Amino acid sequence: MLPSIVISIVLASFVSAESSITEAPTTTAEDNPYTIYPSVAKTASINGFADRIYDQLPECAKPCMFQNTGVTPCPYWDTGCLCIMPTFAGAIGSCIAEKCKGQDVVSATSLGTSICSVAGVWDPYWMVPANVQSSLSAAATAVASSSEQPVETSSEPAGSSQSVESSQPAETSSSEPAETSSSEPAETSSETSSEQPASSEPAETSSEESSTITSAPSTPEDNPYTIYPSVAKTASINGFADRIYDQLPECAKPCMFQNTGVTPCPYWDTGCLCIMPTFAGAIGSCIAEKCKGQDVVSATSLGTSICSVAGVWDPYWMVPANVQSSLSAAATAVPSSSEQSVETSSESAESSQSVESSQPAETSSEQPSETSSETSSQQLSSITSAPDSSATSSSSTTSTFIRTASINGFADKLYDQLPECAKPCMFQNTGITPCPYWDAGCLCVMPQFAGAIGSCVADSCKGQDIVSVTSLGTSVCSVAGVNAPYWMLPASVKSSLSVAATAVPTSDSASETASQEPSETSSEQPSETASQQPAETSSEESSTITSAPSTPEDNPYTIYPSVAKTASINGFADRIYDQLPECAKPCMFQNTGVTPCPYWDTGCLCIMPTFAGAIGSCIAEKCKGQDVVSATSLGSSICSVAGVWDPYWMLPANVQSSLNAAATAVATSDSASEVASASESASQVPQETSAASSQSANNSVASAAPSNSSVSAAPSSNSSGVPAAPSNNSSGASVVPSQSANNSSASAAPSNNSSSAISESVAPSSYGNSTIAQPSTSTKSDAASITGPITTDKVITNESGIVFTSTVIITHVSEYCDQTSAAAVQSSACEEQSSAKSEQASASSEQVKVITSVVWCESSIQSIESVKTSAEAAHKTEVIASCASELSSLSSAKSEAMKTVSSLVEVQKSAVAKQTSLAAVQSSAASVQLSAAHAQKSSEAVEVAQTAVAEASKAGDEISTEIVNITKTVSSGKETGVSQATVAANTHSVAIANMANTKFASTMSLLVASFVFVGLFI
């Protein structure tokens, strides 16, 4: 009994030590693309593992689904993460092994394997510990004790074999095997039963009971798994056979009807069946026995093709070694029937004709040359043509790949973007690979094909052309789903390409480029030559990033669900930039060219230590304390959402150490002085913020004029100047800019030496209850006194990187100033609200740590009291005294921890109140923007203002939800009766946790000594 108490305390300590993991922040904004990520629903009724299979589970297994997901680092809704956690899977598996027997165990484990396979987990899909797996295997062979052991099974003889035997010959002897194979399963069974009426009902019942195949759980239309792009959840024969059956030689078709029940796969899961040697071996042995020569090559090529399309790695179709040997021997054998040989050659001729007709560069349209090409293709070509999808073929509706190509699957998608020197290199022979000529992903992973292209490019191109070709190759292979390094070039070819990339092109190509560029520029935009040309040249010279090739609308790559093929900064930075601390934002502009990733590929950039290390080192250098924690948490969050595995954001060890050190450092005194300067009198604000006003105004102008292109606001002397709103701890500020007569025509808004006045007042509050006042009458009249319209310059960069500078004429000056001023107030309030959210999240995280210490203290107190009771019974006064001392220390630590919990709860309440008031500020400012926009009579201004109103409303809705969450935390945290502690609870809670750890060490030594002593005494 006593040793078990020691073990429980040790386990509790391990749990408390691991509870310091910072969870990735959750986002619920409607415009956040992650909230509609297609393959993971962010909620669950039970948990992400149980929800989708609960209704199909046996009754005995259903109570086992309600296990605690808190023992894992996974979100409770994340199916894939829960599947690979042995702690969670083991708890469910142990429960099933205990409560279920026989077929119920098989059904439950098959469903678990199925849902984990659908979620994208690798073999063995559901990660159950070995001892639990043994228990499940034993339970699966046990006989159920229930009296409901199916009477129907015993009363109905096993007609399953009879049904299978009767259906197989019928399909083989049929004059139209393709139609039979593509019909529905129910149709086939009905035809068989009509031929053998006596055994129809037993066969149907027995096959249902004896089969170990569990079909995929049915799901409603709004479940994202029902639109999972690459796997159809049904099959006529099975997931392997359906898509290639019509293209198989006649001798191989009967081999497709193997039993999928010998695998843990759902019968429709192509990828799972491809990697199961038991299933692949049965098919391969049958083909080796029934087929010879070219028929074996065709069948194995089709098998490799379908497995490659399903995303399986090399060698794609996992056939056992002995079966592979049999297939190789059969492929070299000569068919015994001359009729079979003639039939095979005619099919090959038809295949070669279709391939030739799709090649644009060939001149085989004349009748005489067609006959010769047929003959040569029969003798030399070992390429298996792409399956022709027809109206009766099931593959025409389930495939996610285009089964044809003009050149080949690799070249088609990038040919138009290639430099001229590289285009001839694309016409390499795909016959040296086992790939279908149209399969981009398969061709990407074949070194012999990639090496031929790479060697040709290295010989034909130099300098920037090499970089463009390799970037395009990497891009198209990444889009095709190939893992890093995407385009599998041999090492020797990579070296040749690297050397060629550093070489300087000859003068002929340089002069040709120089002669083409000016004429092209002058013909497009004569009035903007000066601003376009430098931007174009610099972007072409400095950028090594090549965007993904554009593809037609019917190409499935254009609707690839989880990756946007463009980015403003890069795929890592775009989605978290607005939430980052200011100190970390400059760190996002690292060069993606040091990686093989497309610049827009979030997941790829997350796993590249060179890119992640550069960002991490910059953050460690520029940020301190909570800013470091926020930045790294956002990085982990975006990488987790992109599907990267733990630890999500792959930082090098030395950079991680630097970030840990920076996270514990205290921010410098600059921030304190900045706060102090912001709280000075209103008369000093214009002089202190004149430089900042210009920058803020430029941002306001950019936001007031929406466009499809990105807007780059650069501070200049002729930009409008509107000051940003003061922070919540300032006493109020009034900025009075004006404009002199000398520069009234060139400035968008007044500077400090002009004559007009625009004022804005913000009332301070302890919780940030700031309110915005409408511009006064005198302000409007002063702004209206400006004669005539004013102008401002707007700098726009389009998608091609060309910079335009346009002039905006502002006629409603007063309303324009009101709108930009209100936009600045809303922007400031939004930033302060984000800061309050961060403060709340930090306090919540610290509260979890302290509550963990409280729980540990309570557990330790109970254990020591038990030891003390035993010592009192044994009259061991020394042990009793030691226990009393430890109980006093632990009680003191628990009391301090409870005070800290109360303090952290108050901090969170304060942060929520602050966010609520700032949401009101945003709403008020948005109303001012909308009113001013309507007064301007500008549709663009109204659209921007309406967006601001929507954002302000959304901010208020989010705050309401968070208040409910905080209220629940307070009630569960036992707020009543706890005295108020200091608000700066960060250091205090860490001290409490450290003290608890120290007490744990001393208590453990006391407990071990006491247990040994009491045990010897007894």
From Swiss-Prot:
Glycans are attached at residues 698, 708, 718, 729, 743, 753, 769, 798, 965. A lipid is attached at residue 989 (GPI-anchor amidated serine). It comes from Candida albicans (strain SC5314 / ATCC MYA-2876). Belongs to the RBT5 family. The lineage of its organism: Eukaryota, Fungi, Dikarya, Ascomycota, Saccharomycotina. One of its GO terms (cellular component) is side of membrane. Residues 148-164, 767-785 have a biased composition (Polar residues). The gene is CSA1. The GPI-anchor is attached to the protein in the endoplasmic reticulum and serves to target the protein to the cell surface. There, the glucosamine-inositol phospholipid moiety is cleaved off and the GPI-modified mannoprotein is covalently attached via its lipidless GPI glycan remnant to the 1,6-beta-glucan of the outer cell wall layer. This is Cell wall protein 1. GO terms for biological process: intracellular iron ion homeostasis; single-species biofilm formation on inanimate substrate. Induction: Preferentially expressed during the mycelial growth phase with only low levels of transcript detected in the yeast form. Induced by iron starvation and ciclopirox. Positively regulated by BCR1 and RIM101, and repressed by TUP1. Expression is also regulated by EFG1, CPH1, HAP43, and SEF1. Disulfide bonds join 60-100, 64-95, 74-81, 83-116, 251-291, 255-286, 265-272, 274-307, 421-461, 425-456, 435-442, 444-477, 583-623, 587-618, 597-604, 606-639. Heme-binding protein involved in heme-iron utilization. The ability to acquire iron from host tissues is a major virulence factor of pathogenic microorganisms. Required for biofilm formation. Residues 32-143, 223-334, 393-504, 555-666 form the CFEM domain.
